[in-house]
């Protein structure tokens, strides 16, 4: 009997190796449970890498694809793109006297990001050409830094080009895992805690200011301030419940929708105006980057813009690796055995993110790209591979960009701020705390947080990495195992490059009066 069972299993494995997906596919009715059917689908898929993958022949659409595509992916990315563009608008308006960008600009740029990049990099790239590359989405940990990036004199296009080039080099030389090993858990934890805490405080302040500032002909200013407290209080309870029941991947849509409903129910509806017209946004790159009077109002990037963008591009790429590896590990934890062929390829994903970063921004966008976590995590939980949901998601995102009016709701403070709180900043804060497991980690984390407050997170990360890798703080046993290049050359080089770039463009002038060299 045992021999018969092993023969059957060996034959199944042999069939999976030799037969095509179409030959191996069996209808769901032949399986005892839906979960077994989905497991079998993952085990028999053979995605073609940079070849044409077709529905029916190489993969199928299932109801479960709607979970990552509709619930988490689409709603999540509308909130994130809107938040990124609002951060750019606020930061650039503050940084430059001639620039005045507002909500209309943010919505228009978000719609640009939701059209061609969604078509090229969701539908075509991850759907049809390489289903092993996860979708290129939004780099959550960089959102709290966008204001600082703008104030530092950086240029979105310069940042995108540097980020794209560094990302391509990293994926070509397979350097992602090297960067992960260079930054200790204490240093990474401190960085995430600082970004999570400062971001959380800024979102809470924004909701409070919005609620207190509500006024109309019938409503006195300050009389509706309690709405902010109710929105925040209810969302904290919901977030805690979702965490308890392992449904945190639903946090963005549930909490954003809750914020919308509460604000409307308590009478703040007069503040929500649907002004965005149906149609296409301006898709001419010359409009966005061609002059200082329209679009981004920055013109083409200069050498100074590239130098100002350099430290942030280095940090963004360094933060890619743990993000990408985390998404792949999450897939491995949720998928059955023998599904290696459908797991996301970290280097392919990095290549796609790098190209998408440059293409999306060149077309007029301002997103900072990374592996799309709000897509991958629910997809892994739903036991679905990348392509089916990617195609549905890309089509949904493009539809909303053309409709226009959902974007007005997405940038309304009780919606956008709640989405950022539960989708970016609280998870960053929690992830940072989980990384600090002992006194050695807390030393590095403390120095990183202190350095971030004194100067900025980029310089603090580089300095803490140098101190930590040389055993001056943190785990001395870990430091003893590192080579001279890992201890001194790479961390020291990153620190010197970042410091020179910051001093050259006067990034520390407003804080410490250090004049720009250029």
Q: What are the functions of these language-model segments?
A:
Residues 64-80, 224-235, 250, 265-266, ...:
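Hydrophobic, membrane-embedded alpha-helices of multi-pass small-molecule transporters
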Residues 150-270, 392-518:
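Membrane-embedded alpha-helical modules
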């Amino acid at each position: 009997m045992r021999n018969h069972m092993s023969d059957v299993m060996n034959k199944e494995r042999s069939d999976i190796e030799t037969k095509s997906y179409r030959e191996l596919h069996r209808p769901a009715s032949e399986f005892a449970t839906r979960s077994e059917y989905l497991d079998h689908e993952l085990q028999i898929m053979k995605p073609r890498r940079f070849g044409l993958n077709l529905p029916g022949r190489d993969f199928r659409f299932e109801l479960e694809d709607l979970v990552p595509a509709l619930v988490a992916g689409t709603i999540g990315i509308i909130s994130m793109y809107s938040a990124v563009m609002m951060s750019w608008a606020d930061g650039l308006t503050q940084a430059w006297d001639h620039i005045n960008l507002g909500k209309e600009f943010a919505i228009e740029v978000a719609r640009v990001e939701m059209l061609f990049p969604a078509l090229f990099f969701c539908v075509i790239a991850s759907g049809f050409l390489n289903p092993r590359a996860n979708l290129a989405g939004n780099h959550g940990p960089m959102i709290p830094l966008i204001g600082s990036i703008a104030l530092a004199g950086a240029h979105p296009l310069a940042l995108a080009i540097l980020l794209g080039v560094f990302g391509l080099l990293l994926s070509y030389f397979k350097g992602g895992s090297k960067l992960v090993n260079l930054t200790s858990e204490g240093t990474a934890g401190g960085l995430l805690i600082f970004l999570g805490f400062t971001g959380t405080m800024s979102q809470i302040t924004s909701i409070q200011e919005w609620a207190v500032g509500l006024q109309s002909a019938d409503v006195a200013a300050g009389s509706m301030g309690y709405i902010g407290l109710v929105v925040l209080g209810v969302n904290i309870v919901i977030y805690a419940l979702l965490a308890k029941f392992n449904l945190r991947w639903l946090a963005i849509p549930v909490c954003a929708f809750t914020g919308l409903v509460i604000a409307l129910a308590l009478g703040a509806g007069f503040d929500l105006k649907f002004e965005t017209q149906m149609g296409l946004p301006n898709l001419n790159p010359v409009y966005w980057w061609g002059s200082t009077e329209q679009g981004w109002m920055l013109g083409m990037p200069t050498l100074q813009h590239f130098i100002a963008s350099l430290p942030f591009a280095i940090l963004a790429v360094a933060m890619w690796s743990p993000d990408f590896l985390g998404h792949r590990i999450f897939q491995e934890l949720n998928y059955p055995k023998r599904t290696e062929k459908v797991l996301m390829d970290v280097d392919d994903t990095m290549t796609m993110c790098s190209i998408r970063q440059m293409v999306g921004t060149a077309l007029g966008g301002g997103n900072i790209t990374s592996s799309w976590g709000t897509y991958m995590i629910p997809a892994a939980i739903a036991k679905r591979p990348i392509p089916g949901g990617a195609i549905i998601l890309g089509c949904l995102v493009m539809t909303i960009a053309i409709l226009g009016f959902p974007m007005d709701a997405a940038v309304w403070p009780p919606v956008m701020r709640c989405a950022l709180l539960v989708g970016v900043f609280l998870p960053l804060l929690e992830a940072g705390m989980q990384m600090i497991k002992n006194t050695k980690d807390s030393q590095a984390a403390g120095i990183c947080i202190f350095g971030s407050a004194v100067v900025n997170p980029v310089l603090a990360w580089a300095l803490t990495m140098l101190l930590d890798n040389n055993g001056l703080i943190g785990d001395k046993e870990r430091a003893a195992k590192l080579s001279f290049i890992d201890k001194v050359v790479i961390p020291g080089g990153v620190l010197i490059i970042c410091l020179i770039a910051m001093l050259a463009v006067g990034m520390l002038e407003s804080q410490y009066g250090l004049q720009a060299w250029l």
